[in-house]
Amino acid sequence: VINFNMLLLNPGEPAVIKFITATVTEILDNYNVDAIHLDDYFYPYQDIGNADAATFKRYRYRNDSIYSWRRNNVNQVIRNIHLAVQSHNRQKNRKVKFGISPFGIWANKKDHPQGSLTKGLQSYSVQYADTRKWIQQNWLDYIVPQIYWTFETDAAPYAALVDWWASTVRGSKTQLYIGHAAYQPGKSERWNNPHELANQLRYNTRHPEIRGTCFFSYRSIFAPDNKIQRQAMEKIILEYWKYPAKTP
């Protein structure tokens, strides 16, 4: 699909799902990788309009809406990658993991009864990424939601989202790691507290479901570009990174 001056792989096409699965299999067969990791790109954040209308007409299932059809397309991609990784592990006696780092909001509670107490963009309906289903189906070994907001962000408060993700993975086989925005301190008034990230790490300890944290990006940690960012990372390094971390 060509849209917004970009070339996008259309997951509504069976050939695309086959291609993505084959690419993952090629990586598994030829490289000694620890994991297959996907970032937060599924359907684009921008509305693609009717760019995939012909594919929808050709492959829709019964009375599916285009929205549920798109979600199912992404589900098929995720399931196929999961199966490819599992097959590789059985055949090669390996323990390669499959994980995803999605946008931090699955759905808002006002639009979906199982959603979080948020008012932001929803990956379920914008990117057609049903991350909650992937966890319930145990298709993921780990998930790293990008919770790139502060405790005081009205539309997406940090604590509400951490609580939601911890509750969502509870009882599943999917391990939860929280994605933190190391690049944000000092970039806006809301991020002017150098203790924000450290407070987030402290809050994480309330939930035994949280196995660890990930930061974006490496550059912000080791080459901070403003005073508040530097203070934020120094606090984490001195208080939280004094000891070796356990390997997931």
Model-derived features: positions:
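Aromatic- and acidic-residue-enriched carbohydrate-binding clefts of CAZyme catalytic domains
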Residues: 1-10, 46-72
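Alpha-helical packing segments of well-folded alpha/beta enzyme cores
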Residues: 16-27, 73-84, 130, 161, ...
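A structural motif corresponding to the C-terminal end of an alpha-helix
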Residues: 26-34, 76-98, 133, 137-140, ...
